[in-house]
Amino acid sequence: MAVGSFVALGDSFTEGLDDPRADQAGYLGWADRFAEMLAARQPGLRYANLAVRGKVLRQVTEEQVPRAIAMAPDLVSLAAGGNDLLRPRGDPDALAEHFDEAVRTLLMAGCQVLIFTGFDTRFPVLRLIRGKVAAYNMHLRAIADRHQCRLVDLWSMGVLYDPCAWSADRLHLTPDGHRRVALRACEVMDVPSAADWREPWPAAAGIASSPARAWLAARRTDLRWARVHAAPWVARRVRGVSSGDGIGPKRPELLPL
């Protein structure tokens, strides 16, 4: 199927955090990068990105899905549910039912749907929700199979297990992490690309340290992460505030690149 228009839906992952633009404010991210790769093969491609950081699945389906349908795009990407699973009451089974309904709604509107699973992040704190993410991913794979949708399985992308793929907050990808996801999306969508997302990361330079020193350095990094990133996130949850409050989509109209 030729793709002449593409709308990206979701949260901070699809908005593009932490992949800052070099030429202007805001973020690039995998979706922008994928759209550029797609446009190189499909001149005149129109693209919109309705994703906003902090959004939970219900907000994505209620606020973004109807707007996407109104644009009548050929392709819609849907990556959502991660913010729900970070919450203690996040239920992967209930989320999957909601996700399936959104996919069916998009398909009935004539859109092709590109689904993303959740990541297998291996940092100590996020490991606490690993089981919930795994269960949710099983549902997402079943949804993709049931509706014959293309699926980008982020969990199986071993190259993203490397800390180099993740920014300091351990929740968002680095620019090269986003680039690799865009390349994987191209592969799933049969879009030729010159690079390979499996390419090994550059070898880390530095002086080798003893296991004890390495352990201490890792714990210092964990403490700094808790102070700089985890504590503010918890404080926002207590106040009922989202990082996306007051922020609109970065590319709300379906326009040529």
Which stretches of residues belong to each language-model region?
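Charged helix-capping and loop-helix junction motifs
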Residues: 92-100, 130-137
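Structural beta-sheet core signal
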Residues: 8, 78, 114-115
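Substrate-gating cap/lid alpha-helix
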Residues: 123-155, 175-179
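Short glycine-enriched, charge-decorated loop/helix-capping segments at active-site entrances
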Residues: 19-25, 90-93, 128-131, 167-168
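Conserved catalytic region of serine esterases and O-acyltransferases that act on ester linkages
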Residues: 146, 176, 180-257
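A short helix->loop->beta-strand "cap" motif at the edges of active sites that frequently abuts
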Residues: 108-113, 149
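Oxyanion-hole/transition-state-stabilizing segment in secreted/luminal serine hydrolases
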Residues: 15-19, 43, 57-94, 121
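Serine-esterase "nucleophile elbow" of acetyl-processing enzymes
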Residues: 1-53, 65-72
